UniProtKB/Swiss-Prot annotation:
InterPro entries: 2Fe-2S_ferredoxin-like_sf, 2Fe-2S_ferredoxin-type, 2Fe2S_fd_BS, Beta-grasp_dom_sf, Fd_pln. This is Ferredoxin. It comes from Bumilleriopsis filiformis. Pfam families: Fer2. Keywords: 2Fe-2S, Chloroplast, Electron transport, Iron, Iron-sulfur, Metal-binding, Plastid, Transport.
Length: 98
């Protein structure tokens, strides 16, 4: 199934809706659709690509960096996050983790 993922960041002037299949990582879908998001390891093992889920649901079971508190607060790693519903994600949220 393909979901609509809204990517937002006021500072970076990002407000875009991308289509993301439920078997594609949000970061990869964004890149394919011309939206540059930060990343480093692409393996869910660092925080460069961190975002925050504002609404909707995602699956990031492959990530190994965020702790339960951070995930509970809505943070996600876009490089290993699949959408499981239409969702809205704030990008460039690494600084907000700490």
């Amino acid at each position: 199934e393909t979901y609509s993922v809204t990517l937002v960041n006021e500072e970076k002037n990002i407000n875009a809706v991308i289509k993301c299949p439920d078997d594609q990582f949000i970061l990869d879908a964004a890149e394919e659709q011309g939206i540059e998001l930060p990343y480093s390891c692409r393996a869910g093992a660092c925080s460069t690509c961190a975002g925050k889920v504002l609404s909707g649901t995602i699956d990031q079971s492959e990530q190994s960096f965020l702790d339960d508190d951070q995930m509970g607060a809505g943070f996600l790693l876009t490089c290993v996050a699949y959408p499981t519903s239409d969702c809205k994600v704030q990008t460039h949220a690494e600084d907000d983790l700490y």
